[in-house]
């Protein structure tokens, strides 16, 4: 077992967040080290679009390099985050004895990052907001490729249920 390990990784104060719209998110961690006088003397942050690359120290999106610092909150300095993209990140730290320790891989996913990236269309019933009966909306579509993952963004003032292929999604 490692004596020192970076844990509790957060991006903008959230664990593995989805839909962040901050081009410069804050990445933070805690140092798990019970030894007396324990401290971090340096850190390195790796950010990648591939978890294996991040795990193998390949930060093709960002590699901070080794920074001599006890800082545990770092603002992502680059301007290269793309909308609707999942990023994987980890942090390496060096302890008071110069030993390197590595965090587990965490992730964050960007949102629209600006209204110019919005491609959806609102679905509504064009009735007065005070119209009482609850409308049902149905959208039928076929995909051209096999779906690897998908996300539905739903905005309602009250209750909703989402079904895909006849199966209820969520609670």
Which residues does each PLM region occupy?
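Pro/Thr/Ser/Gly-rich low-complexity, intrinsically disordered linker/stalk tracts
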Residues: 2-35, 107-114
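Predominantly extracellular/luminal cell-surface or secreted proteins
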Residues: 14, 32, 46-50, 94, ...
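Structural beta-strand segments of beta-rich domains
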Residues: 23-27, 137, 148-150
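Recognizes extended acidic, P/S/T-rich segments that occur
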Residues: 31, 38-86, 92, 96-102, ...
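Extracellular acidic, Ser/Thr/Pro-rich low-complexity tracts
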Residues: 31-37, 95, 143-145, 156-158
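Low-complexity, Pro/Ser/Thr- and charge-rich linker/hinge segments at domain boundaries
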Residues: 109-132
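Short beta-strands within extracellular/lumenal beta-sheet-rich domains
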Residues: 131-143
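Aromatic-lined ligand-binding clefts that engage carbohydrates, nucleic acids, or primary amines
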Residues: 141-144, 148-166
């Amino acid at each position: 077992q490692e004596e020192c390990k970076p844990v509790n990784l957060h991006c903008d104060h959230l664990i593995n967040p989805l839909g962040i719209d901050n081009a410069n998110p804050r990445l933070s961690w805690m140092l798990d080290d019970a030894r007396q006088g324990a401290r971090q003397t340096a850190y390195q942050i790796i950010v990648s679009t591939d978890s294996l690359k991040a795990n193998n120290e390949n930060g093709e999106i960002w590699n901070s390099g080794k920074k001599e610092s006890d800082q545990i909150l770092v603002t992502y300095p680059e301007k290269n985050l793309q909308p609707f993209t999942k990023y994987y990140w980890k942090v390496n730290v060096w302890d008071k004895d110069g030993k390197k320790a590595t965090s587990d891989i965490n992730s964050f996913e960007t949102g629209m990052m600006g209204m110019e990236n919005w491609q959806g269309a609102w679905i509504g019933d064009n009735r007065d907001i005070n119209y009482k009966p609850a409308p049902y909306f149905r959208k039928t579509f076929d995909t051209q490729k096999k779906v690897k993952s998908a996300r539905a963004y739903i905005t309602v003032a009250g209750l909703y249920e989402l079904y895909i292929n006849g199966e209820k999604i969520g609670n």
